[in-house]
């Protein structure tokens, strides 16, 4: 994206219907989109711009000729030129040419508000579909802005003020019948636009950033001089109508829209989109350089990989079919895991089949051992069906750590087993039905004797169930507290030798391994270093976040909505750990989940600050790269989430060292 390929377009020199290998394309499912009713307050807001080209525009400009001079040409070699798709093009183009007077659309809205009958325009298409399953919410934020449209039509504009692109709340923008020769790349800032009219200008091309406008339903380009379209228009998966008549568009693109309509052309551009240059590597942000060479360090990676069953065109319609294919994405995921070489890896949304048949085997070559549990729904399923159920997988370096214990926490099942669950309807009706889990492993460093509790969790996603996410978090912390007290009494490890292959004939004797230190015993559970990773589907400042960060939450918290969850909703929620978010050291990342409709922080690596200190972090994704990428997954990021990766130093141990009996020793 940062190199020459970023400006590559579909030029006329490319052969018609060039053949490329692609995975079968999934049928696109519509997403829900709400159109706001435009009232009379939308009119005459052009006075908001007091300087620049917008202010100097004259309201008396009327085009004296049609752009390009050939708005009715249809290539002779294209059949069915009068099918329904092209008939719509001609009809909309005719309507566009009649709208050449100044502020035509704003005046039409005003006339409608006064009850004056005007010629009807093409109705907006209302589509219904399912929301995505990842993220805190996909609903549009409530805006205090009273108007959402601007009409600069018929003004004779030759340039656009940069101030215009600060109006990110705009949903409709009319720039038709002016004298614009180019559209600034900053058009990509107006990501809420559903209607953009650029008809009747002198445009010869569109910027790649047009692909950022993924909410577009209508894009009118009638009567310009456009010969080709940027591949990035393939991101416009919601686009219903592309008005292109009156442009000398090249034959291949014109054939698609004439014969099959807008959707077919957008799909073609999406599937034929070249792989752009990758972004620069994410920076390794060093926070503490004071640690000595002898200081014990541990690295941890957390990653929601987006399971195969969730990576559908209905949820990720902007992504090419190949990008969504699991065979492609799993290779990228594996490559990233290997490149970081983290001591501990916590993966969410890994299905059973992928764990058993791919990741466990592949990561074994890199010294990893794994612990895995699927979500609760896998119980009772046929073996083949259960393979598609996702869960949480925790990997650790086998040469560095000993697995002392592993546990599954099923939030719903744990809740109904609580003594105070009787008569608490919300536990059964809201919480028990959700089968989200956490996986806990208890590890010991073979050489240093330090022990670690590692938690890998995935909470429920739906923003309408804030109470469920909060109670899942409370149960998680309650169960970790119980386990930590058990682990504080765990006996010393007596066998720390890592497996070693016997030397082959002719090989020199390897130096003997360093004598391992005895196991460290901890006086209480909250003294054991704790690392808690996962997709909590909760933003900073949410109830779930605050409970983890502050150690307590009041029973009257509004997220509980006065629902009944036993003692958790009667006396409140607490935990004894002093936890901090690793990325809180840099004010958190701009996002950990990135899609066209949602960009926020959902994923975390929490650590016990009394026993661990964060020393380095993997930084954010390059900002320039994101200017032309509306959402993940794509060819460089295989999930809608990004990986978190942190390095910690182990603080001085507050427990006492327990000498383990290693048996007879050689002198």
UniProtKB/Swiss-Prot annotation:
The name under which this protein is listed is CCR4-Not complex 3'-5'-exoribonuclease subunit Ccr4
Q: What does this protein do?
A: Acts as a catalytic component of the CCR4-NOT core complex, which in the nucleus seems to be a general transcription factor, and in the cytoplasm the major mRNA deadenylase involved in mRNA turnover. Ccr4 has 3'-5' RNase activity with a strong preference for polyadenylated substrates and also low exonuclease activity towards single-stranded DNA.
Which cofactor does the UniProt annotation name? Mg(2+)
Organism lineage string: Eukaryota, Fungi, Dikarya, Ascomycota, Pezizomycotina
Q: Tell me which residues bind Mg(2+).
A: 349
Q: Does the keyword ATP-binding apply?
A: no
The gene name on file is ccr4
In the record, the note on similarity to other proteins reads: Belongs to the CCR4/nocturin family.
Give positions of region: Disordered.
18-40, 55-140, 502-522
Q: Which keywords has UniProt assigned to this entry?
A: Activator, Cytoplasm, Exonuclease, Hydrolase, Leucine-rich repeat, Magnesium, Metal-binding, Nuclease, Nucleus, Repeat, Repressor, RNA-binding, Transcription, Transcription regulation
